[in-house]
């Protein structure tokens, strides 16, 4: 008997992007599970990780000449600005607002990955882009990476 095929709506079959998406969802789950005392710190961790992840994607788009980068980067900026506002909301004790933001963020993120990031992943695969190599070019195999 064969194992059933599993569908992961956040998988783009590009390991470095898939790992980033998985980490984002893990941090978002921590926000969801955080009690009121720890919510602000969990949200701050999510915002910091997201800022770094968006910066990486923005750099990849610029470095590879991705045609749709402007719209993609605008989405990153707008969402990150709203997320940063959540830090202020948490500091002011509006924790329910932060929890609602987390709930809405999950929905947006799934759509963003399935549309914007899926198109970017297709572009990066076409360019044979690998951030471990510092950009475009042949991907380093795990054997070659281990020897380096």
Each model region followed by its residue ranges:
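Small-residue-biased structural context
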Residues: 1-148
